[in-house]
Amino acid sequence: MKVDVLLGLQWGDEGKGKVVDVLTPNYDVVTRFQGGPNAGHTLEFNGEKYVLRSIPSGIFQGGKINVIGNGVVLDPLLFKQEAESLAASGHDITKQLYISKKAHLILPTHRILDAAYEAAKGSGKIGTTGKGIGPTYTDKISRNGVRVGDLLHNFEEKYAAAKAKHEAILRSLNYEYDITEMEAQWLEALNYLRQFKLIDSEHVINNYLKEGKSVLAEGAQGTMLDIDFGSYPFVTSSNTICAGCCTGLGVSPRNIGEVYGIFKAYCTRVGSGPFPTELFDEVGDKIGQLGHEFGAVTGRKRRCGWIDLVALRYAVMINGVSQLIMMKSDVLDTFDTIKACVAYKMNGVETNEFPYEIDDTIEPVYVELPGWKTDMTKMRSEDEFPEEFNAYLSFLEEELGVPVKIVSVGPDREQTIVRYTEE
């Protein structure tokens, strides 16, 4: 067996939680391989809405194994809150969830450092969620991090050393803080974490594959936020692309199977950073209102714009996407015409390749397509798709070179249509 991967192809918030919930019945194991509690996956189960920040979305499927991989950074306090919320709703996850010993811990001082660094940047801030993600990955790369497996040996010494280094940095920044209460809660949450099975996830995942178990790897955020290939420096601190699955779980590239690339029928972005197709008019406001575009974790209003095929082609290439999944098609139901960016104009020169750096001087080159002007929310089969919508899908497939296999026409699970188009 191979690991199938589900990835966001834009700037995050594509709707991965819902799609994972639809796909998980087909898998034995669901994993997370990167990121932390800065991004939430929203999904509905039995009429209830849940936001999962660190726990894999397969947790609602009875009998599924869920693994938090080594590439994830874990905040014990936020993890405890998330797990207890699930338990209060009748979901006991202690037997279903395994955690990699090699996953790094987000310390209380990481969160303080995050706030201090952002404050020091002034107008140049990147819009961090303040969850300590960046400083935790910084410590990981500089070999100063504290890992989940350290709970089993010499934890107090390693924690004290990391905390002392952080406090020295904060003194140099003249940043005032008090972590007394947060630290007490965090240390209490560590004890809660100990009840879960702490594993050498690379061995466990590869043994599952040898046993013939099917594995789905669930990415967080989106390709355009990747630390290497995203719109740097307005990116996250981990590899959100398909290659991140290999390093974040310990699997060979030869063991990657299907790569599902998920995108919205339009674009959104949260926080600072370039956004070539952003709309500042009533059209952008309308998309945001119809799409309920607010962050699952931060509650921040998302910036909205037309679909960017330059960025999407780039994301498809980087990830080796084999199947596309389009979300929120219904949000565009009422538009007379729909625009799609097919190229950028930079210094008067047109290009269809994603550049080294994108900024406000980039001018999107649009094509216009007729809208379908039809309520798609009640459709349950591709046979019901209006002609204009089929034309839009064909246009996207031609531009991206990959079939759109799944179309979402609403937030509920049954509003997910699998297309049976030929290869």
Curated annotation (Swiss-Prot):
<feature type="binding site">
    <location>
        <begin position="328"/>
        <end position="330"/>
    </location>
    <ligand>
        <name>GTP</name>
    </ligand>
</feature>
<feature type="binding site">
    <location>
        <position position="40"/>
    </location>
    <ligand>
        <name>Mg(2+)</name>
    </ligand>
</feature>
<dbReference type="GO" id="GO:0004019">
    <property type="term" value="F:adenylosuccinate synthase activity"/>
</dbReference>
<feature type="binding site" description="in other chain">
    <location>
        <position position="236"/>
    </location>
    <ligand>
        <name>IMP</name>
    </ligand>
</feature>
<feature type="binding site" description="in other chain">
    <location>
        <begin position="13"/>
        <end position="16"/>
    </location>
    <ligand>
        <name>IMP</name>
    </ligand>
</feature>
<dbReference type="InterPro" id="IPR042111">
    <property type="entry name" value="Adenylosuccinate_synth_dom3"/>
</dbReference>
<keyword id="KW-0963">Cytoplasm</keyword>
<feature type="binding site">
    <location>
        <position position="13"/>
    </location>
    <ligand>
        <name>Mg(2+)</name>
    </ligand>
</feature>
<feature type="binding site" description="in other chain">
    <location>
        <position position="300"/>
    </location>
    <ligand>
        <name>IMP</name>
    </ligand>
</feature>
<dbReference type="GO" id="GO:0005525">
    <property type="term" value="F:GTP binding"/>
</dbReference>
<dbReference type="InterPro" id="IPR018220">
    <property type="entry name" value="Adenylosuccin_syn_GTP-bd"/>
</dbReference>
<dbReference type="GO" id="GO:0005737">
    <property type="term" value="C:cytoplasm"/>
</dbReference>
<dbReference type="GO" id="GO:0046040">
    <property type="term" value="P:IMP metabolic process"/>
</dbReference>
<feature type="active site" description="Proton acceptor">
    <location>
        <position position="13"/>
    </location>
</feature>
<feature type="binding site">
    <location>
        <position position="302"/>
    </location>
    <ligand>
        <name>GTP</name>
    </ligand>
</feature>
<dbReference type="InterPro" id="IPR001114">
    <property type="entry name" value="Adenylosuccinate_synthetase"/>
</dbReference>
<protein>
    <recommendedName>
        <fullName>Adenylosuccinate synthetase</fullName>
        <ecNumber>6.3.4.4</ecNumber>
    </recommendedName>
</protein>
<keyword id="KW-0479">Metal-binding</keyword>
<feature type="binding site">
    <location>
        <begin position="296"/>
        <end position="302"/>
    </location>
    <ligand>
        <name>substrate</name>
    </ligand>
</feature>
<feature type="binding site" description="in other chain">
    <location>
        <position position="221"/>
    </location>
    <ligand>
        <name>IMP</name>
    </ligand>
</feature>
<feature type="binding site" description="in other chain">
    <location>
        <position position="129"/>
    </location>
    <ligand>
        <name>IMP</name>
    </ligand>
</feature>
<dbReference type="GO" id="GO:0044208">
    <property type="term" value="P:'de novo' AMP biosynthetic process"/>
</dbReference>
<dbReference type="InterPro" id="IPR042109">
    <property type="entry name" value="Adenylosuccinate_synth_dom1"/>
</dbReference>
<keyword id="KW-0658">Purine biosynthesis</keyword>
<dbReference type="Pfam" id="PF00709">
    <property type="entry name" value="Adenylsucc_synt"/>
</dbReference>
<keyword id="KW-0436">Ligase</keyword>
<keyword id="KW-0460">Magnesium</keyword>
<comment type="similarity">
    <text>Belongs to the adenylosuccinate synthetase family.</text>
</comment>
<dbReference type="InterPro" id="IPR027417">
    <property type="entry name" value="P-loop_NTPase"/>
</dbReference>
<feature type="binding site">
    <location>
        <position position="143"/>
    </location>
    <ligand>
        <name>IMP</name>
    </ligand>
</feature>
<feature type="binding site">
    <location>
        <begin position="408"/>
        <end position="410"/>
    </location>
    <ligand>
        <name>GTP</name>
    </ligand>
</feature>
<comment type="function">
    <text>Plays an important role in the de novo pathway of purine nucleotide biosynthesis. Catalyzes the first committed step in the biosynthesis of AMP from IMP.</text>
</comment>
<feature type="active site" description="Proton donor">
    <location>
        <position position="41"/>
    </location>
</feature>
<feature type="binding site" description="in other chain">
    <location>
        <begin position="38"/>
        <end position="41"/>
    </location>
    <ligand>
        <name>IMP</name>
    </ligand>
</feature>
<feature type="binding site">
    <location>
        <begin position="40"/>
        <end position="42"/>
    </location>
    <ligand>
        <name>GTP</name>
    </ligand>
</feature>
<keyword id="KW-0547">Nucleotide-binding</keyword>
<comment type="subunit">
    <text>Homodimer.</text>
</comment>
<dbReference type="GO" id="GO:0000287">
    <property type="term" value="F:magnesium ion binding"/>
</dbReference>
<dbReference type="InterPro" id="IPR042110">
    <property type="entry name" value="Adenylosuccinate_synth_dom2"/>
</dbReference>
<comment type="pathway">
    <text>Purine metabolism; AMP biosynthesis via de novo pathway; AMP from IMP: step 1/2.</text>
</comment>
<dbReference type="InterPro" id="IPR033128">
    <property type="entry name" value="Adenylosuccin_syn_Lys_AS"/>
</dbReference>
<keyword id="KW-0342">GTP-binding</keyword>
